[in-house]
């Protein structure tokens, strides 16, 4: 009897089974292009991204309409959008170029459900989109998400106030150079796929003025123009022609989001 049990045990000796190729394989960590998403600690990032959809941004797509309820907020990952304000019967003027370092839906952070501004896609790309109610819920329940988004509000306030000063004090050439440098930073590319019409609207000036100034920059070898395309050839020289406002805006953005000391000068 014992022999039979031993023989049975030997015949059914445990051998390692071949592994399922998919078993034990970890999904590679996703790379997030949006700066705000990247800055969140892992638990908060997982909570936020878990409520988001990955969506395409199409040219001239309206992401936010003035004085209408906000259904979604966006964390752009690629491309660029233009946040604009209106002044009576005049054409809208850009108050912020929004890219992969930004967030669309600031009123939701502040407890509002409508925005006084429009936001339209200028350069196609992708974004993480979250429903307005889901974002409000996360802001209330996760202090890290709340703190980061409030810091972003601070950066945006500095951006808007600096633009007001720039538009009233500096020449068209300085302002255009500033706009190109900020667009290059938002897109993380030396190539800016926009028309003179878009730039004229962004700066609140006539298109003829943009065409003349851009022609001068091209003649000096600082940029190269194509069909709805601008390439920055000499960023250093463009910075020399620009006012200091682009540095103030970009530095304030970084310092606001990096802030660990509330007494630190944001735009130092």
Place the predicted regions along the sequence by residue.
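Cyclic nucleotide-binding regulatory module and flanking cytosolic helices
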Residues: 6-58, 103, 108-109
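A conserved hydrophobic position in a structured secondary element of the catalytic/binding core
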Residues: 40, 76, 98-99, 122, ...
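Alpha-helix/helix-capping structural signal
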Residues: 43, 78, 133-134, 155, ...
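Cyclic nucleotide-binding regulatory domains
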Residues: 61-123
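Structural motif
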Residues: 80, 125-127, 229
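Cyclic-nucleotide recognition modules
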Residues: 96-154, 158, 162
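Polybasic "coupling" helices that flank or enter modular domains
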Residues: 122-124, 139-206
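Phosphate-/nucleic-acid-contacting segments
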Residues: 182-268
